[in-house]
């Protein structure tokens, strides 16, 4: 690989933001884009009811509800680093899609609400990051409101999320008494001013905590700060880059995203310390980003990003080599050679054609139904990247068509939406009712809305008497026997795999006991 290409890889930072709904993820996303020059004006959360909606929330239903339902990709440049930010669905129902986004990043930013502390969605997402040893930085948001004691928050993060905290900045007061933060490593006092552009009144470089200017600026709050820092030095962990990169320690910043305060300090540390593109595990070997041959995997399919064109785009994470427009690659699953002429990069709704891209970059490739989640593009090697699963759904609905003449359109719509991976579809071995399965119930609303607006299909749901699903594999003869005996509970999923839908956990356990020669899987790697 050329020196130039190596430098390009080292400049890349690819990450996602994880948080509980309403912790401020959309706001901090926009402020990062603002610093990166990718947008000129932040679509403030408070202005959501007006015509301007958050740049990263572009689907119609998201605009109506003020939540991020889809995951989009945004690219910006900051201090000569190329940053790829993958926006994850913020609503707690969208964990499956969020999980797959986390397979495509090298690090994550965790946003914690200073008022509410650690919440359930954050715990789930951090568990996913922990499986992959993903390095995590933390931003404690909403310091401009009356929140919880920062020591209490640090303690909660360590105990609940089981990760060491290394405070990088420390708040001076909060709510009405919020004066700013003190940077423990640069010894800078960052003054908060809600009226100032980007929330920062001034940054004062101090010789240390005994600098007399501290008292001049902060008055009685200077003594509070000195007391806090003294406590921290005894109790908190100092920042260790090795522990951070291993996913064992999280550097913690405090601020107020809506006021753009504290975001720059976070971003500076992020580009300097977050990992460049990391090696990726494939079935046969580990793939280094510095290898010459191109390799990439699809982690997301998004249909109808442009309502005018009814298109579908597959999002690919480049793992090695260099992408150039027009290059021919092997679509491994299909054993077919394809030329990529129309790859795009994203800035929320805006797309631009890409002439070249490097490991860590996310490119979008137009897709007419041939690309599936987990597919690999290579220069010929039979590679299959691991760790991009489907999860067994926990909620099920029967789909009833209101117009019987639309059955073909229904099949097309359900199949395409399932290929995006937020819901799964199951066709019965016996009977006509399609079943939609989802990890979270909000996805059913999304499917109904999109069937009507994108496929012109009106349908209703009826409850389906199922509680869980498992994919079933085993010897051909045994599978045939199983399908005969359990025909009313056997379905074929959107990729042609046999699935068993059970009405209760007891029923599933009982069936598994009766069919010990078969394997029942709660997750399934994309084929």
From Swiss-Prot:
GTP binds at residues 19-26, 87-91, 141-144. The keyword NAD does not apply. It is found in: Cytoplasm. One of its GO terms (molecular function) is GTP binding. GO terms for biological process: regulation of translational termination. InterPro entries: EF-G-like_DII, EFG_III/V, G_TR_CS, P-loop_NTPase, PrfC, RF3_C, RF3_dom_3_sf, RF3_GTP-bd. It comes from the Bacteria. HAMAP family: Rel_fac_3. GO terms for cellular component: cytosol. This is Peptide chain release factor 3. The keyword GTP-binding applies. SUPFAM superfamilies: EF-G C-terminal domain-like, P-loop containing nucleoside triphosphate hydrolases, Translation proteins. Residues 10-278 form the tr-type G domain. Belongs to the TRAFAC class translation factor GTPase superfamily. Classic translation factor GTPase family. PrfC subfamily. Increases the formation of ribosomal termination complexes and stimulates activities of RF-1 and RF-2. It binds guanine nucleotides and has strong preference for UGA stop codons. It may interact directly with the ribosome. The stimulation of RF-1 and RF-2 is significantly reduced by GTP and GDP, but not by GMP. Its main location: cytoplasm. Keywords: Cytoplasm, GTP-binding, Nucleotide-binding, Protein biosynthesis.
């Amino acid at each position: 690989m050329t020196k130039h290409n190596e430098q390009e890889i080292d400049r890349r930072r690819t990450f996602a933001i994880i948080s509980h709904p309403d912790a401020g993820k959309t706001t901090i996303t926009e402020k990062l884009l603002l610093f990166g020059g990718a947008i000129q004006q932040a679509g403030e959360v408070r202005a959501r009811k007006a015509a301007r909606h958050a740049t990263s929330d572009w689907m119609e239903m998201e605009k109506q509800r003020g939540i991020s339902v889809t995951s989009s990709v945004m690219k910006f440049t900051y201090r000569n680093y190329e940053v790829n930010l993958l926006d994850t669905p913020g609503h707690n129902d969208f964990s499956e899609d969020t999980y797959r986004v986390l397979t495509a990043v090298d690090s994550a930013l965790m946003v914690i609400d200073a008022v509410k502390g650690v919440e359930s969605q954050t715990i789930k997402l951090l568990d996913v990051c922990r499986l992959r040893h993903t390095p995590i930085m933390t931003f404690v948001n909403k310091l401009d409101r009356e929140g919880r004691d920062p020591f209490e928050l640090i303690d909660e993060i360590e105990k609940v999320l089981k990760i060491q905290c290394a405070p990088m900045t420390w708040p001076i007061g909060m709510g009405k008494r919020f004066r700013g933060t003190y940077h423990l490593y640069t010894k800078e006092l960052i003054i908060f001013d809600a009226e100032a552009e980007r929330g920062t009144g001034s940054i004062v470089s101090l010789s240390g905590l005994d600098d007399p200017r501290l008292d001049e600026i902060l008055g009685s709050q200077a003594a509070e700060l000195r007391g806090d820092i003294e406590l921290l030095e005894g109790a908190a962990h100092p920042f260790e880059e090795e522990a951070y990169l291993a996913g064992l320690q999280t550097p913690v910043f405090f601020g107020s995203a809506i006021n753009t305060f504290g975001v720059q300090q976070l971003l500076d540390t992020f580009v300097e310390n977050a990992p460049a593109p990391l090696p990726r595990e494939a079935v046969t070997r580990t793939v280094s980003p510095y290898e010459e041959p191109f390799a990439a995997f699809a982690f997301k399919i998004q249909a109808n990003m442009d309502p005018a064109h009814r298109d579908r785009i597959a999002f690919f994470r480049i793992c090695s080599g260099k992408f150039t427009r027009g290059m021919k690659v092997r679509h491994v699953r299909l054993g077919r050679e394809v030329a990529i002429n129309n790859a795009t990069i994203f800035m929320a709704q805006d797309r631009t054609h890409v002439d070249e891209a490097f490991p860590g970059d996310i490119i979008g490739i137009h897709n007419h139904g041939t690309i599936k989640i987990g597919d690999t593009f290579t220069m010929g090697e039979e590679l299959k990247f691991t760790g991009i699963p489907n999860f067994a759904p926990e909620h099920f609905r029967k789909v009833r068509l209101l117009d019987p003449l639309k059955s073909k359109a229904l099949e097309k719509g359900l199949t395409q939406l399932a290929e995006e991976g937020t819901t799964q579809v199951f066709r019965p071995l016996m009977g006509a009712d399609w079943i939609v399965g989802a990890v979270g119930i909000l996805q059913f609303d999304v499917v109904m809305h999109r069937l009507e607006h994108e496929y012109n299909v009106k349908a209703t749901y009826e409850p389906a008497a199922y509680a869980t699903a498992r994919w079933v594999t085993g010897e051909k003869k045994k599978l045939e026997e199983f399908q005969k005996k359990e025909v009313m509970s056997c379905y074929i999923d959107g990729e042609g795999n046999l699935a068993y839908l059970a009405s209760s956990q007891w029923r599933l356990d009982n069936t598994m006991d009766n069919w010990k020669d078969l394997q029942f899987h709660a997750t399934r790697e994309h084929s």
